[in-house]
């Protein structure tokens, strides 16, 4: 058995901070991404924007759309379109679950976080449905109440 070294946390390269505010995430999946050489260099430089991204299931494959990976500075002719569709690497069972989930009205799949794991770029995707304004207000109210409880408990 191989010797285990200390566990390193996944290095988050990009996060979709608005996602948990605008959507209620029900389930998450970890997916690999098929990237070109210059794209992975840009990802390592943290030049990624997940804000407008979403995932589509087409012909038994999962594709990530609208995720902006900036062109690599020294990439010249090897750079590709920053907003191109990128294939996600998932098991067939996971893809079929995602496909079934998107058939439900109001459910979407969004990228939550991009990180490196053992040298490979991974994306944490979430099956989510959009929050309404009153849902957001309830979340803010709960957070404020928790802060007040923490403040009071800090003194005792």
UniProtKB/Swiss-Prot annotation:
<comment type="similarity">
    <text>Belongs to the SmpB family.</text>
</comment>
<protein>
    <recommendedName>
        <fullName>SsrA-binding protein</fullName>
    </recommendedName>
</protein>
<keyword id="KW-0694">RNA-binding</keyword>
<dbReference type="GO" id="GO:0003723">
    <property type="term" value="F:RNA binding"/>
</dbReference>
<dbReference type="GO" id="GO:0070929">
    <property type="term" value="P:trans-translation"/>
</dbReference>
<comment type="function">
    <text>Required for rescue of stalled ribosomes mediated by trans-translation. Binds to transfer-messenger RNA (tmRNA), required for stable association of tmRNA with ribosomes. tmRNA and SmpB together mimic tRNA shape, replacing the anticodon stem-loop with SmpB. tmRNA is encoded by the ssrA gene; the 2 termini fold to resemble tRNA(Ala) and it encodes a 'tag peptide', a short internal open reading frame. During trans-translation Ala-aminoacylated tmRNA acts like a tRNA, entering the A-site of stalled ribosomes, displacing the stalled mRNA.</text>
</comment>
<keyword id="KW-0963">Cytoplasm</keyword>
<dbReference type="GO" id="GO:0005829">
    <property type="term" value="C:cytosol"/>
</dbReference>
<dbReference type="InterPro" id="IPR000037">
    <property type="entry name" value="SsrA-bd_prot"/>
</dbReference>
<dbReference type="InterPro" id="IPR020081">
    <property type="entry name" value="SsrA-bd_prot_CS"/>
</dbReference>
<dbReference type="Pfam" id="PF01668">
    <property type="entry name" value="SmpB"/>
</dbReference>
<dbReference type="InterPro" id="IPR023620">
    <property type="entry name" value="SmpB"/>
</dbReference>
């Amino acid at each position: 058995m191989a010797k285990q070294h200390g566990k390193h946390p996944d290095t988050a390269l990009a996060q979709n901070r608005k996602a948990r505010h605008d959507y209620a995430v029900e389930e998450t999946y970890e997916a690999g991404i098929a990237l070109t050489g210059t794209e992975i260099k840009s990802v390592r430089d943290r030049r990624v924007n997940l804000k407008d991204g979403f995932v589509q299931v087409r012909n038994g494959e999962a594709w990530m759309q609208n995720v902006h990976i900036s062109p690599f500075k020294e990439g010249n002719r090897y750079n590709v379109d920053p907003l191109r569709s990128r294939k996600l690497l998932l098991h067939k069972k996971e893809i079929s679950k995602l496909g079934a989930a998107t058939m439900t009205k109001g459910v979407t799949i969004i990228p939550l976080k991009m990180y490196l794991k053992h040298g490979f770029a991974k994306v944490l995707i979430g099956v989510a449905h959009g929050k309404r304004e009153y849902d957001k207000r309830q979340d803010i109210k709960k957070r404020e109440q928790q802060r007040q409880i923490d403040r009071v408990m800090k003194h005792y």
